[in-house]
From Swiss-Prot:
Matching PANTHER family: RIBOSOMAL PROTEIN S15, BACTERIAL AND ORGANELLAR (PTHR23321), SMALL RIBOSOMAL SUBUNIT PROTEIN US15M (PTHR23321:SF26)
Subunit structure: Part of the 30S ribosomal subunit. Forms a bridge to the 50S subunit in the 70S ribosome, contacting the 23S rRNA.
The species this protein was found in: Staphylococcus epidermidis (strain ATCC 35984 / DSM 28319 / BCRC 17069 / CCUG 31568 / BM 3577 / RP62A)
Gene Ontology annotations for the cellular component aspect, listed alphabetically: cytosolic small ribosomal subunit
Task performed by this protein: One of the primary rRNA binding proteins, it binds directly to 16S rRNA where it helps nucleate assembly of the platform of the 30S subunit by binding and bridging several RNA helices of the 16S rRNA.
Molecular functions per Gene Ontology: rRNA binding; structural constituent of ribosome
Family as reported in the entry's similarity comment: Belongs to the universal ribosomal protein uS15 family.
Annotated signal sequence range: none
NCBIfam families reported in the protein's UniProt record: S15_bact
Gene Ontology process terms (BP): translation
Keyword annotations: Ribonucleoprotein, Ribosomal protein, RNA-binding, rRNA-binding
SUPFAM superfamilies associated with the record: S15/NS1 RNA-binding domain
Entries under Pfam families matching the protein: Ribosomal_S15
Protein name: Small ribosomal subunit protein uS15
Length: 89
């Protein structure tokens, strides 16, 4: 269900704003999107796993708040990010 540390490091390198960046909204949104995708695959197979479903909903909400923040601060970075991640908004 969770993404591997190696995959997380790849996402951080791809979406970071500067060399030591790990906490920018872009990085957080990219990592959350990967975790949401992995959890979605798990829930397709395990339909009655309501505990994981609640975790998924919390992650989606956290990502939504980060996307709203990024959109309010820098609309261009927001548009580039949702296009590269393939998020419908």
């Amino acid at each position: 269900m969770a993404i591997s540390q190696q995959r997380k490091d790849e996402l951080i390198k791809e979406y970071r704003v500067h060399e030591t960046d790990t906490g920018s909204p872009e990085v957080q949104i990219a990592v959350l999107t990967a975790e949401i995708t992995a959890l979605n695959e798990h829930l397709r197979e395990h339909k009655k796993d309501h505990h994981s479903r609640r975790g998924l909903l919390k992650m989606v909400g956290r990502r939504r708040h980060l996307l709203n923040y990024l959109r309010s601060k820098d609309i261009q970075r927001y548009r580039e990010l949702i296009k590269s991640l393939g998020i419908r908004r």
